[in-house]
Curated annotation (Swiss-Prot):
InterPro entries: SVWC_dom (IPR029277). Residues 1-26 form the signal peptide. One of its GO terms (molecular function) is toxin activity. Its main location: secreted. The lineage of its organism: Eukaryota, Metazoa, Ecdysozoa, Arthropoda, Myriapoda. Keywords: Disulfide bond, Secreted, Signal, Toxin. It comes from Ethmostigmus rubripes (Giant centipede). This is U-scoloptoxin(16)-Er7a.
Length: 110
């Protein structure tokens, strides 16, 4: 195998592995949240200490109260992976609490 072909195969393998990691791991974001008594206040009637989690089942999120910059608190939101369209398959939204609520494809003959 030539060195150019080896490089092409190596690049393809790296691309495929990184694509699988990106698809299987969903996404995370960190954002501002109201603070009350040093805790996260998502305005749902509850206060959450740093490290505590709560769930938004409607949007399929897991939210964690985290330590922000300079003593502030923030919310870290985890959500489901984004799926590419799979022709001939049906995207299923199972409901439930994150991560069980994450959509998935149901394909015939699979």
């Amino acid at each position: 195998m030539t060195s150019t072909r080896k490089l092409s195969v190596s690049c393809l393998i790296v691309f495929m592995v990184s694509s699988l990691i990106a698809v299987s791991s969903g996404w995370l974001s960190i954002g501002k949240i109201a603070i009350k008594d040093g805790k996260c206040d998502p305005k749902n009637g509850n206060l959450y200490a740093i490290g505590e989690k709560w769930y938004n089942d409607e949007d399929c999120f897991e939210i964690t109260c985290v330590q922000g910059d300079k003593g502030s608190v923030a919310q870290q939101v985890a959500s489901c992976p984004v799926h590419a369209v799979k022709p001939g398959c049906e995207l299923v939204f199972p409901g439930g609490t994150y991560p069980k609520c994450c959509p998935y494809y149901e394909c015939p003959n699979s």
